[in-house]
């Protein structure tokens, strides 16, 4: 029972981390690309 309760929490946390990390990486990548194009 304990494993069943811990696994969904870990999955939600994993999705939340990736949900925040992917847009951040793409946002930083777009900024660096824009600065590179300006030069």
Curated annotation (Swiss-Prot):
Keyword Ribonucleoprotein attributed: no
Recorded family membership: Belongs to the PsbE/PsbF family.
Residues forming coiled coils: none
Subcellular location: Plastid, Chloroplast thylakoid membrane
Cofactor binding: number and manner: With its partner (PsbE) binds heme. PSII binds additional chlorophylls, carotenoids and specific lipids.
GO MF term (any one): electron transfer activity
Membrane topology value: Single-pass membrane protein
Classification via NCBIfam families: cyt_b559_beta
Protein's name according to its UniProt entry: Cytochrome b559 subunit beta
SUPFAM superfamilies: Cytochrome b559 subunits
Segments crossing the lipid bilayer: 14-30
Species of origin: Beta vulgaris (Sugar beet)
UniProt keyword annotations, A-Z: Chloroplast, Electron transport, Heme, Iron, Membrane, Metal-binding, Photosynthesis, Photosystem II, Plastid, Thylakoid, Transmembrane, Transmembrane helix, Transport
Domain of life: Eukaryota
Free-text function comment from the UniProt entry: This b-type cytochrome is tightly associated with the reaction center of photosystem II (PSII). PSII is a light-driven water:plastoquinone oxidoreductase that uses light energy to abstract electrons from H(2)O, generating O(2) and a proton gradient subsequently used for ATP formation. It consists of a core antenna complex that captures photons, and an electron transfer chain that converts photonic excitation into a charge separation.
Principal location listed in the UniProt entry: plastid
GO cellular component: chloroplast thylakoid membrane; photosystem II reaction center
């Amino acid at each position: 029972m304990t494993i069943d309760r811990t696994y969904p929490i870990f999955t939600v946390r994993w999705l939340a981390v990736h949900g925040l990390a992917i847009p951040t990486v793409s946002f930083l990548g777009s900024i660096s690309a824009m600065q590179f194009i300006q030069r």
